[in-house]
C-alpha cells in the first residue's frame, strides 16, 4: 500500500464514522506563542479542547503537517542516523470534542488496523499499553477487544512524579490532562528490543504506531484532578511509521515516498545510492521540512522560525558537500517532492517556484563561506584533542554562517565533543554588546480585569463615554494629573487600536475643561483598548464622564492609505501573479508600506501598471462596503485572506466594487474616490523572496509629484538644457567627458603602481617552491590588476597578493605564475583574503580580484598569506 493510499484510507475510514475531514493547519501556529511550529495534530484544536473555541462539528479527522526542529521538540541531530527521526512528518488523527470517549476511540483504532476491509494487520502483531490506574481502558482492551492480558501493559508513573508517565498526557502544569493508551507493532524477533516497560524497551522491535489520549481531567493549581464535564479524545497515528508497517519494511526511509526522494538526492549529488548513507537520508528528510515551511510563509533569516529553517537548509547543503556536491543542488529536489506530495498538499504545487527560489538563494549564500569555513574547522579538528573550543564554534557561526548544530554534527562524526558551554558564553558576550548598543522600547502588558471596550469608530468619530481605568508607569492609578504620561481605558471608544498593520488612532479625551491627548491606541487585551498619551491640562479620574474625539485629519489619511493598500494588493496579484501574498504591512497617515512574497524585483513597467490599475479604481469612485458574515459565506465571496491566518466564526468582509474583496477589521474610506491619488515611491528587497513597496496617497502624492517637478526644473537649470528633452543628452555628454578623464587618471595611476610593484618583486619572500609578495600599495582596482599581471609575467614561481584602500573600501588582487596554478590558485587565495576583510570575490586560477569593507584587518590578513601558501605547497 502506497503512502498516499494509506493517507486517504485513514481519512475515509473516519469519515464513515461521522468525522468531518479538516484540512491540515499551517506549520506556523497562529495565536499560540508557546509553539515554534505545529508539531501535533491537536495543535489546531487546542482552543476547542480548552473551551475557548467552538466548531460546527464534534468529531474531526486530519492529516496534519508537523515539524520538530528547534525548541523543546528537536529531532535534528538524530535525523538521517535512525530509522524514524524526521524534521517533517505527517500525523494522522481523529478527535472527539465531548462526543465519544474511550470505548469508541479504542474500537475505531482496532477496526481500522485489523479489519480486512481496511489495513488487515495481524492481531498477534499488536500490543497495547494503558496508564496503570486506567482500569476502564484496560478492561475495554481485555473484555471487548479480546486482547490477551500478557499483551496489555500497564505503565505507571515512570518519570519521577505522580502522573509523570509515558501514558499520562498533560497540556501544562494545569489544565486538561488524562491517561492515554498506545498501540505498538512488532517488527519481528530478528530485531533487538523488548515490550514497553521492559529494560529493552528502547530497542526497535516494538514500535508505537497509535496513541489515544483521553482528556478526562482538569488539573487545578493545587494539583487536584477534577473530572471534565465533557471528556474528549485526541489520537495520533504517524503516517510514515504506519506506511513502513504496511510495506513490510523496518525503516521509514524504506517506504515508497522516501525511496523516490533518496534516488533524487543521489541523482542531484552524484553520490551512489545506498541505504547505508546517512547523508542521503538527511537531505531527503530536510527537503520536506524546508519546502513545506517556505510554502507556509517561513523564509530563511537570523531569528525565530526563519533561523530554524536556515539551520535545516545549511545542514542539508553541508551533507551534499560531504557527498562531493559543491554546487547548488538542494532546490532541484523540490520538483521531485511536488511529484510525491503535491496531490495531497496543493500548496506545494502553487508555491513551487517560490520554494525553489528561496532555497537556491540560501544555498548560494552559504556556498560563499562553506568551503573556507570547512577549511578552518578541519584545521582546528586536525590539531587533536577531545573537545572543539567554543571560540572556534562561535567564529564559524558568526563569520561563516555555520549554525551550532551543523558544527556539532561534524564533531560527532569525528568523536570530538563540541564545547557548547563555551559557545554559549561567546554568544552571550555578543548579546551583551548588542544590548549595550541598543535601546529598547518597553511594551508593557497593563493589568486589567474589568469590562471590555466597545469600539464605535466605524460609524462615530466622537463618543460619550466613561473612564474605566487609568495607568501611569505601567501601574493602575485612580487619577492622572497635568503633565502625567499614561493610558486610559474607556467603555465606548471611537479610537481604532493598532491592528492588521494600521496604526492606532490619535485625538483627545475631554472631561469638561480637562484634556488628555491621545498619541496612540493599542489593545491591552483582545477586546480592551488602551488610549496612550499625556494629560495636557487638568486631571482625569476613574469614573469621569468624558468625550472621546478622534483627530479627523489623521484618521482620514489612515483610511486613504489603508483602502489604497487593498487596491494595491489586488493589483499586485493581477500584475505579478497569484503567488503574491501579503507578508506584512504598516499603514500610517504618511504612507502605506506593504511587504509581499515575490522572487525578484518588481520592474518599472510592472510598478507603472499597478499604479494605473489602482488609480483607475480610484477614478471609478465606487462605494466601499463592509459586512459581517460567517466564514463560510465570506469564502463564497472569494474574499482575499491571509494564508494560514486564524479567523473567527464571523469575519468582516470589505468590498470595493469589483476591484477588491478582502477580510479586514480596519477603517476605510466611504468611496474609492476619497483616496484622491496613488503613487508608489519605492520598491526593494528585505529578505529572500520578500519585496517591500511603499506608496502614498492624496495630498501627499500631489506634494511628491510637485517636488519631482521642481527637481527636474533644477536639473534643467544646472545643466543649461533648453528643454526637459535636452536634459538627458546634457547629462550623458557630461558623464562621457568625466569617464574619459577617469580613464586618463587610471592610466597614470597604473603606470605609477607598476613602477612601485617592480621593487616588490625584488623584496619577495622566498619559500622555496614559490616567491610570495603580499603588500598594500597606492592604487585603484584597475591599477592593482595591471600591477599583479605585470609581476606574475616577470617570474615563473610568483604568488602575488596586493591590496589597496580607496574611500574606505578594500580592493584585493591575487596572481599566480602559470607554472604554479596546479598547486596554488589565485581564486582560492583572494577568497581566503577577502573573507578576513569583510568581503568576497574570485576569478581565474592565475588572476582573481575581490573587495572588502574592513581596512583595519589588512595587516593581519597580509601576514596570514604566508601560512596559507605554505599549507598549499606542502
From Swiss-Prot:
Binds 1 zinc ion per subunit. Keywords: Aminoacyl-tRNA synthetase, ATP-binding, Cytoplasm, Ligase, Metal-binding, Nucleotide-binding, Protein biosynthesis, RNA-binding, tRNA-binding, Zinc. Zn(2+) binds at residues 562, 566, 664, 668. SUPFAM superfamilies: Class II aaRS and biotin synthetases (SSF55681), Putative anticodon-binding domain of alanyl-tRNA synthetase (AlaRS) (SSF101353), ThrRS/AlaRS common domain (SSF55186), Translation proteins (SSF50447). Its cofactor is Zn(2+). GO terms for molecular function: alanine-tRNA ligase activity; aminoacyl-tRNA deacylase activity; ATP binding; tRNA binding; zinc ion binding. Signal peptide: none annotated. It is found in: Cytoplasm. The keyword Cytoplasm applies. Its EC number is 6.1.1.7. CDD domains: AlaRS_core. It holds the Pfam family DHHA1. Its main location: cytoplasm. It comes from the Bacteria. GO terms for cellular component: cytosol. It catalyses: tRNA(Ala) + L-alanine + ATP = L-alanyl-tRNA(Ala) + AMP + diphosphate. GO terms for biological process: alanyl-tRNA aminoacylation; negative regulation of DNA-templated transcription. It is an enzyme of class 6 (ligase). HAMAP family: Ala_tRNA_synth_B. Catalyzes the attachment of alanine to tRNA(Ala) in a two-step reaction: alanine is first activated by ATP to form Ala-AMP and then transferred to the acceptor end of tRNA(Ala). Also edits incorrectly charged Ser-tRNA(Ala) and Gly-tRNA(Ala) via its editing domain. Consists of three domains; the N-terminal catalytic domain, the editing domain and the C-terminal C-Ala domain. The editing domain removes incorrectly charged amino acids, while the C-Ala domain, along with tRNA(Ala), serves as a bridge to cooperatively bring together the editing and aminoacylation centers thus stimulating deacylation of misacylated tRNAs. Belongs to the class-II aminoacyl-tRNA synthetase family. This is Alanine--tRNA ligase. It comes from Neisseria gonorrhoeae (strain ATCC 700825 / FA 1090). The lineage of its organism: Bacteria, Pseudomonadati, Pseudomonadota, Betaproteobacteria, Neisseriales.
